[in-house]
């Protein structure tokens, strides 16, 4: 633990030096330079102008999108040599070098070529830094919004089934519990992240795959296997990283879908609302989304027990950004979700009555599970770059609070708070020993506070009186406590530190890294080591090795 604290202090010292240098340069770029770039983006095959294409000045927070006519303009750019990157889903990413100068306006046009297998898409799960998918040292599969739209998937769980090597199982027809399997391994061996942060707790994972609406997802990155040291010891079978949508241009949409389940009287209704706003100078923006879903219970064989539970789900959230300078950016995200799910028998009766053979009107014991969730999730991230494009620093904090009221043979209440905070630093070497390289290091602290207790009173009182009908006072209280399940209050703190160096060029990539996690309920720290490589340009065999001890 002392080593982690020392590492944290060293990182803070290094950060302060970098920030001082960055802010010194920022003062220079706040003065208008009148250095502008304009142009258009067209489809290489058809010559058609393409709207909504993303244009960014790499190494800065400056960017724009093409308008409805396929044109763009970047104004008051910092002086120097930069790389402009143009990208869009379904097209190969194109980059061009450009030198900007004070009072200089220049035209720069782009042609985009269709990318049928999305090898040029940018991913972050391979090494916690933006990397083209074909250059990533580990194989990253990507689920784009197009997949969700074409398959009419309204939730994460529905979309994941279209990813090879990934299987979503519905393991309980009573409550609808689902888990994701990668390479055949159980769900507990898969690390689920939201914007690269491990705030998807064990409690959230029980029903969470169905609780994340598709309209908040920009893409889902899936890594099969544990070929990265930058994620925790839970990433054994693989990692699923849910990247949320950010505002790109001013737009809005409204949609409603209705699906019938196997020609029965059960329907799944889903209503979505999306609004995106970006200021005229592209310095701030917000993406607001909402979903309302209602699915009636489905009884496939008419035996009185549901195969799919009844669902009522409402989600609302936003994702916003503010560019504090040309080299720094603040992101904030929040969403709130309410869900009611009820499965089993006696759908129109209260759970405890539907389960009692003397009260439910059937003379047979029922089987019932009912859950009500209230979930709040938020995150804050601050990114900082330097003008020479060698330093990339980020601070982040994320949290998720879950309140769940449940019934399964008895009423209960569960609350869970998961919080994550940390810092990450990336340094780009022009040459490290034999090749350009990116060195990544960081620290992370994760806190989880789980409280689970029974709220049933009458049921345990009746059980106590059945044992001793004459019991009163203290004796009755002792008997009630005897039958009441013990409450659980568990607090877990995990300190983590990781480092990784990746040598890469257009044809070769070598990576070595390690991570240490100190869990408060374990005596020894968990060490994770990994190595991977990728070679060749058109055929890219990859090798990965990792160990956990």
List each language-model region with its residue ranges:
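Short, acidic, small-residue-rich periplasmic hinge/interaction motif at the N-terminus
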Residues: 22-29, 34, 40-48, 53-58, ...
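Short, acidic Ser/Thr/Gly-rich low-complexity loop/linker segments typical of extracellular
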Residues: 60-71
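Short acidic/polar hinge/loop motifs at secondary-structure boundaries
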Residues: 73-76, 179-181, 197-224, 245
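Extracytoplasmic beta-strand/coil segments of soluble accessory domains associated
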Residues: 157-198, 218
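Outer-membrane beta-barrel translocator/receptor signature
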Residues: 201-203, 216-218, 229-241, 245-301, ...
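Transmembrane beta-strands of outer-membrane beta-barrel pores
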Residues: 258-262, 279-281, 292-296, 336-340, ...
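Flexible loop and strand-edge segments within Gram-negative outer membrane beta-barrel domains
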Residues: 295-315, 321-393, 399-418
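Structural signature of Gram-negative outer-membrane beta-barrels, strongest in the C-terminal barrel
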Residues: 325, 434-440, 444-448, 480-549
């Amino acid at each position: 633990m002392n080593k982690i604290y020392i590492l944290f202090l060293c990182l803070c010292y290094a950060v302060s030096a970098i920030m001082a240098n960055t802010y010194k340069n920022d003062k220079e770029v706040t003065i208008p330079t009148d250095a502008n770039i304009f142009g258009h983006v067209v489809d290489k095959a058809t010559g058609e102008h393409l709207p909504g294409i993303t244009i960014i000045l790499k190494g800065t927070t400056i960017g724009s999108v093409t308008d409805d006519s396929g044109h763009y303009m970047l104004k008051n750019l910092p002086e120097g040599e930069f790389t402009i990157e143009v990208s869009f889903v379904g097209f190969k990413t194109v980059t061009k070098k450009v030198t900007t100068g004070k009072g200089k306006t220049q035209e720069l046009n782009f042609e985009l070529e269709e990318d049928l297998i999305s090898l040029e898409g940018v991913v972050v799960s391979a090494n916690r830094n933006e990397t083209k998918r074909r250059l990533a040292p580990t194989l990253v599969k990507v689920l784009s919004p197009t997949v969700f739209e074409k398959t009419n998937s309204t939730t994460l769980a529905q979309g994941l089934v279209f990813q090879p090597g990934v299987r979503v199982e519905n393991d309980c027809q009573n409550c609808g519990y689902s888990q994701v399997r990668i390479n055949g391994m159980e769900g507990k061996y898969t690390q689920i992240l939201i914007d690269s942060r491990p705030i998807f707790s064990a409690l959230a994972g029980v029903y969470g795959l169905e609780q994340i609406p598709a309209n908040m997802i920009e893409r889902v990155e899936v890594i099969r296997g544990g070929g990265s040291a930058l994620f925790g010891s839970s990433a054994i079978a693989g990692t699923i990283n849910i990247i949320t949508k950010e505002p790109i241009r001013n737009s809005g949409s409204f949609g409603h879908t209705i699906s019938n389940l196997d020609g029965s009287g059960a329907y799944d209704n889903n209503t979505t609302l999306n609004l995106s706003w970006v200021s005229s100078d592209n310095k701030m923006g917000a993406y607001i989304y909402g979903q309302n879903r209602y699915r009636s219970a489905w009884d496939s064989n008419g035996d009185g027990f549901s195969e799919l539970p009844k669902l009522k789900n409402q989600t609302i959230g936003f994702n916003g950004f503010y560019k504090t300078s040309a080299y720094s950016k603040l992101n904030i995200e929040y969403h709130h979700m309410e869900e009611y799910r009820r499965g089993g028998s006696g759908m129109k009766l209260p759970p405890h009555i539907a389960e009692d053979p003397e009260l439910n009107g059937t003379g047979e014991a029922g089987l019932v599970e009912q859950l009500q969730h209230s979930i709040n999730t938020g995150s804050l991230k601050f990114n900082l770059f330097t003008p020479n494009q060698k330093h990339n620093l980020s601070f982040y904090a994320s949290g998720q609070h879950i309140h769940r009221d449940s019934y399964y043979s008895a009423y209960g209440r569960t609350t869970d708070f998961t919080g994550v905070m940390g810092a990450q630093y990336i340094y780009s070497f022009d040459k490290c020993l034999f090749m350009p390289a990116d060195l990544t290091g960081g620290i992370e602290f994760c806190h989880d506070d789980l409280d689970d207790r029974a709220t049933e009173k009458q049921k345990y009182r009746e059980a106590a009186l059945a044992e001793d009908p004459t019991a009163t006072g203290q004796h009755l209280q002792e008997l009630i406590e005897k039958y009441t399940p013990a409450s659980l209050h568990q607090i877990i703190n995990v300190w983590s530190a990781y480092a990784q160096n990746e040598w890469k060029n257009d044809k070769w990539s070598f990576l070595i890294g390690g991570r240490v996690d100190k869990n408060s309920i374990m005596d020894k720290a968990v060490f994770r080591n990994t190595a991977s490589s990728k070679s060749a340009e058109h055929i890219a065999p990859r090798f990965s090795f990792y160990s956990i001890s």
